[in-house]
Amino acid sequence: AVVDFVRRRAGQCGIVYCMTQADAEACADHLTDKLKDVGTTAHHYHAGMTQLQRRVVQAAWQQGKLDVVCATIAYGMGIDKADVRYVVHASLAKSLEGYYQEAGRAGRDGRPSECLMLYRDQDVGKVQKLLRGFGRKKRRGPKLQRDLDRLDDMARYCGMKDGCRRRQLVGHFGRDPGPSHGNGPCCDLCDARNPALRPPPPAPKPPAVRKRGPPVPQPRRRPAPEVVDLLGDSDDEVPKRARA
């Protein structure tokens, strides 16, 4: 899904936020490999790099020599550019506060921009593990609970089925969301209800032309064996999308 989204915006500047350093590196390699045909380049950016390596990547991105930076959420806040046209969260953000700041990296020049978040329900458990920590770095106490509560708010935001994500996000911080966008694009929920933004129906297919001829003999079929459910109970889900 990230590849298709970035492909449709080839030549534009973007940020992809990833959960871990390994995710950021894998995402950058995948985008560069799959988007060679449109000339899109990507590179990872995280705390595991040396200061010189990060400086080189940031300079290339600032100068337009690099299209996409795949950054960890924890370290990607330091990168900034006015003409970022899109921000993608390849996984669930840790909080609405963090998402608001990260998504705000797009469109700082005042031009239209887009934000996309891909998530699965099981991402909540993964982020909870990161927040709780491991071994000697395992966290406890009220600060951990506060972070877990913020994660719950983020999950509820992603699970919205109606309403407006923009109004929900702005209202979370006690601000007036202002008037609606009318017939213009807003969030995925509003756009789905907006007739002006619905794609036109596909053109009807021409009727099939049947050629007359002698009947084709059909081979005799053996009785079909009993069908066995090879998949079983699968927990896999298609990534859900949230755009605000």
What are these regions (language model features)?
Residues A1, R243-A244:
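Accessible peptide chain termini
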Residues A1-R139, G178-P179:
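Helicase motor core with emphasis on the C-terminal RecA-like subdomain
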Residues L66, D83-V84, L92-Q101, G107-D236, ...:
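C-terminal accessory region of SF2 helicases/translocases
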